[in-house]
Amino acid sequence: MKEKRKCECFSNPAVRGILIALVAVCLIFSGCEKAGVDDSAINPTVTVEEGVALPRFEQEVLLCSDEAKQVYDGELKIENAVATGTPYRPFVFEYQLDQASGILRLSEDSSFADAQEYNLDQSKTSVMIDNLKTGTTYHYQVEVSGKQYSGTFRTASSNRFISIPGVENLRDIGGYKTLDGKTIKQGLLIRGCELDGIKNEDYFLADQDVAAVQKTFGFVYDLDLRSPEITEGDYQSRLGAQVGHQFYDAPTYAQIFRPEYQDSLRRIFADLADPDKYPMYLHCTWGRDRTGTVVLLLQGLLNVSQEDLMQEYRLTGYVTPAVATNNKMDTVFMQLGAYEGDTLQEQIINYLTTVVGVTQEEIESIQSIFLE
């Protein structure tokens, strides 16, 4: 995969004394106390005027643990990484202000048309920012007393792990490079566990967290791979009444080849082909078996390598350690090999179109939605 980068952090006390105003994006996604992570290297700061210091971004900023990055880069096996704890790392912007307050703006666009704003309070020394994209250039702007300071930084390429209160096994399926040199877009499909606590009461998205989740992700569809039998009567997505929802009773692993699951798969891929259903949250109960199977087929038809497909599946080992080493997908790959095609992508597409009933137009729509 990609070149290795170090985690960075501004937690050195000596440096804090220098940051008199806005280390206007002391964006050290990897370091900070949210996950009990040790601080590491320091970005040097530059004083731009009296009372104002800004970071100089000499390296990319890491949004995951060192071990998770090593897994991504092919330097460490996932089974050796899962014991190190959660792979997610927030971005922490540390600062000191000699004014009462300031504003930090972050955007992927240099015009700041879609900027997210964060208040900087003189009584605090940091603001934590969750769920930025990996492998992405960000523009930042800090405003204090009518003066603006701006710059850019880039996040390191890695798996994009997601943090949502009360929910686990979350990640963006985007960011992967395909075998033909394209990239799966981030921000379109987040995979995870159930949100309603029906099977596991610990997995529950609380009412007070819904607005923040929607501000970040803007989900319009809840693709629920569970059976409708888990609940009685009308069902509403925890993501909000305005969010579309459907149960699919999806298969797991080699069940995808059983005739009784063909209609379920056909409906799933028909909805994955609908551009109006994105951004989408895709899940089952644990975000493991049914979700892992559907994501494998989806990323496979997008031409992700078999090695990366297995890595994406086994990242669930951070929540369920046994998944980091299990071989349940081997039967899936073996049976897909019986279908016409010189590549795994061709075999998956032929299976979906000739057996499941997914149309070629739907395949092309999915590829158009996800690839850049």
Where are these predicted regions, by residue range?
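Bacterial N-terminal signal peptides that target proteins for export
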Residues: 3-18
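Sec-dependent N-terminal signal peptides
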Residues: 20-24
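C-terminal motif of bacterial Sec signal peptides marking the signal peptidase cleavage site
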Residues: 27-31
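Ser/Thr-glycine-rich phosphate-binding loops at phosphate-binding pockets of nucleotides
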Residues: 286, 290-291
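Cys-dependent protein tyrosine phosphatase-like superfamily
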Residues: 33-281, 293-372
